[in-house]
Design a protein with these regions (language model features):
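Conserved beta-loop-beta element that borders a ligand/cofactor-binding pocket
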Residues: 120, 141-164
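NAD(P)H-binding glycine-rich loop region in Rossmannoid oxidoreductase-like domains
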Residues: 39-111, 122-125
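Residues forming the Rossmann-fold NAD(P)(H) cofactor-binding site
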Residues: 14-18, 98, 137
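Conserved glycine-rich Rossmann-like NAD(P)H-binding loop of the short-chain dehydrogenase/reductase
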Residues: 28-36
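Mid/C-terminal beta-alpha module of Rossmann-like enzyme folds, strongest
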Residues: 2, 200, 204-264, 278-306
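SDR active-site strand-loop-helix element
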Residues: 9, 34, 76-77, 116-122, ...
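Substrate-positioning beta->alpha
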Residues: 100, 164-165, 184-205, 211-212
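N-terminal Rossmann NAD(P)H-binding glycine-rich loop of SDR-like oxidoreductase domains
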Residues: 4-26
Length: 306
């Protein structure tokens, strides 16, 4: 891979940090992290070879300046509290996922960048009723129609040493006598190790998968219940599972939506109970990567936590 300067929006987040490390490991890339708070981002990702630049999606001039001299922009932004929106703080899928992508597209074109890489989601669909799936689908369309070379990744549930979902589930299992599964527990999920996603992003920076959209999940398609049993086996904390009806969860979400910093919402219930399956064959054909089986990845994760 020729030496490049890669700008990364969302570089201090869980997925972004893994991408930064993978790009630096290539030895062929200078990484520039776009962030509202460079000091805070540096504290979370203090690695040699990373440049931190102040930029905000609501300030177009700051984005253009931050992208000057870069070759590629990677959009891996997720808002705080994802997937629970907080409209009072402007943390919505429409503003962050869709409008944020459009702002980065405009800035990239003004700054003369040639390549846009987007971390979308497995259920992205511009016609979806869920605001998150719809916003990501609309962002994808904007990217495809931008005239920039692009690669779009649609991951299923992403996990790793620093994720909040799988690690959070493991922490609950450590102390709770039983575990409440959202919905029926039959919703499909295909957990993908964050390092595998980051490896594909690095290959995309070098030109692989150009102008393509690729779903990415692990090699194992499973139900949420089955994933919980794998997490329990890996952590050594087996607990009885019970299922929380969606109707009850939505009622609780409706109440919590009224709080200044809601921990649950009705849309978040839809998000966690939706199928999150992937067709990974196009990705495997194009990128030739060996995806990590869930039992191996989660056993590795459990060891990292000890």
């Amino acid at each position: 891979m020729d030496a490049k300067t890669v700008a990364l929006a969302g570089g201090s987040g869980f997925i972004g940090r893994a991408i930064v490390r993978r790009l630096l490991a290539s030895g062929q890339t200078t990484v520039r992290v776009l962030t509202r708070n460079p000091e805070e981002a540096r504290a979370r990702l203090d690695l040699p070879g990373v440049e931190f630049v102040r930029a905000e999606i609501g300030r177009p001039a700051s984005l253009k300046d931050a992208l000057a001299g870069a070759n590629t922009i990677i959009d891996a932004i997720q808002f705080d509290g994802y997937p629970v929106e907080n409209p009072r703080r402007g943390l919505t899928f429409e503003r962050i996922d869709y409008a944020g992508a459009v702002a980065l597209i405009d800035a990239a074109k003004q700054a003369g960048l040639q390549q846009f890489i987007y971390i979308s989601g497995a259920a992205a669909d511009e016609n979806a009723t869920h605001p998150g799936f719809r916003a990501k689908g609309r962002a994808e369309r904007a990217i495809r129609e931008s005239g920039l070379a692009y690669t779009i990744f649609r991951p299923s549930l992403v996990y790793g040493p620093e994720d909040k979902v799988v690690n959070g589930l493991a922490r609950v299992l450590r102390f709770a006598p039983v575990f409440g599964v959202p919905g029926s527990g039959r919703q499909k999920v295909q957990p993908v190790l964050v390092d595998d996603l980051a490896a594909c992003v690095m290959l995309a920076v070098s030109g692989r998968g150009r102008n393509g959209t690729y779903e990415i999940g692990g090699p194992d398609l499973m139900t949420f219940d089955e994933m919980m049993r794998i997490i329990m086996d890996a952590s050594g904390h087996r607990r009885p599972l019970f299922h929380i009806p969606e109707g009850i969860m939505r009622a609780v979400g409706w109440l919590l939506e009224k709080l200044p910093k809601p921990m649950l919402s009705r849309d978040a219930v839809t998000f966690v109970t939706a199928d999150n399956a992937c067709d990974i064959k196009p990705l495997l054909d194009e990128f030739g990567i060996n995806l990590t089986p869930a039992r191996i990845g989660m056993a590795y994760l459990a060891k990292k936590q000890k």
